[in-house]
Curated annotation (Swiss-Prot):
Segments of this protein annotated with the region Disordered: 318-361
Gene: rsmH
This protein's name: Ribosomal RNA small subunit methyltransferase H
Subcellular location: Cytoplasm
Keywords per UniProt: Cytoplasm, Methyltransferase, rRNA processing, S-adenosyl-L-methionine, Transferase
SUPFAM superfamilies given in the database record: Putative methyltransferase TM0872, insert domain, S-adenosyl-L-methionine-dependent methyltransferases
Organism from which the protein derives: Nitratidesulfovibrio vulgaris (strain DSM 19637 / Miyazaki F)
Compositional bias per record (Basic and acidic residues), positions renumbered to this chain: 348-361
Lineage: Bacteria, Pseudomonadati, Thermodesulfobacteriota, Desulfovibrionia, Desulfovibrionales
Length: 361
């Protein structure tokens, strides 16, 4: 993994004609809602921590005018190459870095940017990654059991985890990240199967998980039995929750007053992390409820702009069924000493802790 500008990454510069066409036709999820949340302004500096195929970034560039700039990050060199092509009309005002979004500060520092006016992350696996069998994210087409978003980084492929982890580790991963009630049966089935030879392909793993499920579960389930296992392994391989936590730890310090943060998630675990973090950062107190008087001295740093997560409209779902699980949450950075919106007093909270009008985000 490198924090260098993408021009130093040769893999990103070499993309297929089919990939370039996919980038041109790509319509990003919740596009109108993201633009409303970020409210890009002319001349602003913005961060897209997961540029992907560049759809959100292109829409941002259209709104920030000739003096605006955008910093684009992605850990997938293929995606970066496609994004460079899509965003080429804006030339040097778009800056590309091959890095994890959690490491965004190194990119901003290289650009000499202290703060930005808005930041967006759209986390999880992309449609392009799912559809490329050789990436190993999906069981719909057979391919190597890889699942790495950055194949040039230091992450180990999913095959290593599947073939080396103990039954307890596998069970914990599938239960924690996949929330699969059959986690124990699946973990044991994987360990038993690999005793006969390594598990190297997505089809092999999907078949093992399918057999581990009771017949009545397979008959009544709306999804393939391997769906949650594949999700869990992908999240573990790419440290997806850890990346999100580290990003949220630092991003508010790099937002200008009035700057906006928008986060799109596709999994309840991710959404829960974002929800709770924005809720805490919008409060003047984060002491435990057992404390009768505020002792933490915490000051509200954001206004939460989305009381509930924003989801796709029926019209968008008709165009893109993969948007069905997308959730957008957004917040606006408060200036030092700026009071948040009027807040409702919570009589059960310690003195000094209130809730936003309309309830906690």
């Amino acid at each position: 993994m490198t924090g260098a500008p993408d021009s130093t990454t040769p893999q990103a510069a070499s993309v297929s004609t089919e990939g370039a066409r996919a980038a041109t036709l790509h319509v990003p999820v919740l596009l109108d809602e993201v633009l409303e949340a970020l409210a890009p302004r002319p001349g602003g500096r913005y961060l897209d921590g997961t540029v992907g195929l560049g759809g959100h970034s292109a829409a941002i560039m259209e709104r920030i005018g000739p003096d605006g700039e955008l910093c684009c990050l992605d850990r997938d060199t293929t995606a970066l190459g496609l994004a460079r092509q899509r965003l080429a009309p804006w030339g040097g005002r778009v800056h590309f870095f091959h890095t994890r979004y959690a490491d965004f500060e190194a990119a901003l520092d290289q650009l000499g940017w202290d703060k930005v006016d808005g930041a967006l992350i759209d986390i999880g696996v992309s449609s392009m990654q799912i559809d490329m069998a050789d990436r190993g994210f999906s069981f719909h087409a057979d391919g190597p059991l890889d699942m790495r978003m950055d194949r040039d980084g230091d992450e180990a492929p999913a095959s290593r985890l599947v073939n080396r982890a103990t039954v307890d580790v596998l069970k914990d991963i599938i239960l924690r990240y996949g929330e699969d009630p059959m986690a124990g049966r699946i973990a044991r089935a994987i360990v038993d199967a690999r005793a006969a030879g390594p598990i190297e392909t997505t089809a092999q793993l999907a078949a093992i998980v399918d057999r581990a499920y009771p017949a009545k579960w397979r008959a009544t389930s709306r999804n393939h039995p391997a769906t949650r296992t594949f999700q869990a392994l992908r999240m573990a391989v790419n440290d997806e929750l850890g990346q999100l936590e580290r990003f949220l730890d630092r991003i508010l310090d790099r937002l200008n007053p009035g700057g906006r943060l928008a986060v799109i998630t596709f999994h309840s675990l991710e959404d829960r992390i974002v929800k709770h973090r924005l809720r805490d950062e919008s409060q003047g107190c984060v002491c435990p409820r057992s404390v009768s008087r505020c002792e933490c001295g915490h000051k509200a740093r954001v206004d939460v702009l989305t009381r509930k997560p924003v989801t796709a409209t029926d019209a968008e779902l008709a165009r893109n069924s993969r948007a069905s699980s997308a959730k957008l949450r957004a917040a606006q950075r408060l200036a030092e000493g700026q009071a948040p919106r009027p807040r409702r007093r919570n009589k059960y909270a310690p003195e000094g802790r209130d809730e936003p009008e309309g309830g906690a985000a």
